[in-house]
């Protein structure tokens, strides 16, 4: 009897692992890359370009509504700025699904200046944000397609944050949209989450961001274990640094959220050279498969 129980347990665990791999393998890096291209073609997603912001919001909703249980636009104000966070929920009908509710997030705005440009004449120009802005969104939109095809075992929230990249401009801070989201949704307390930021570089390197490591270590260990199994070499065993990003507002209220972000920042970061040619479908696919496996694991 004991032998049969062990055998049955082994089979169940094997099936679970196989399902996780099967679903994550459906992530298509080329589809994700196309999402980056389409966002970039709208132009900089900044307050002074409202048409590009409207087009991007409409685009994201268009690719979420057929799949998500519900989508919600949450407008917010901060000082004299107006922003919109987009929230898509995939409700799972699995038993105890809400006890393991997971948040996946990315910012969808872009930097309105390019202060890292070597050419001083270009520093006042906005960045297109192919990597820093569009790449995280692209991964989430492709994941949404997979979640619709294969209902996940947990309830998922995909949240697209506005006004992340206004930091150090006129005294503003980074991660405004996520701060406002946490402030305005005090009832929302998922068991954990992942932020995706700058995840398409052709030479992608994701070390262990230190706020995440210090305050969400168990979740980070799970992610890196999956990455090791998948031979996702972009996930480095080395420590990065402390980065101000959309995970911090969640960490401050006790929600363990891991920031997956390229570091050191690439040389085109916050310049006009953050363009589509810097992006790799292979990098997008590697990150997307790891996150998908985390969901189905």
Name each region found by the language model.
Residues 1-4:
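Positively charged n-region of N-terminal signal peptides that target proteins for export
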Residues 124-218, 222, 234, 242, ...:
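Acidic/histidine-rich catalytic neighborhood of metal-dependent amide-processing enzymes
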Residues 23, 34-96:
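A non-catalytic alpha/beta surface segment that caps or lines the substrate-entry region
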Residues 31-38, 55-66, 135-142, 176-180, ...:
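Extracytoplasmic/secreted proteins, especially bacterial periplasmic and envelope-associated proteins
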Residues 22-26, 41-52, 73-77, 123-134, ...:
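Second-shell loop/turn segments in exported
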Residues 10-18:
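Hydrophobic h-region of N-terminal signal peptides that target proteins for export
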Residues 45-47, 77-79, 94, 108-112, ...:
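Solvent-exposed loop/turn segments at secondary-structure junctions
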Residues 73, 192, 201-297:
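Active-site-adjacent substrate-binding region
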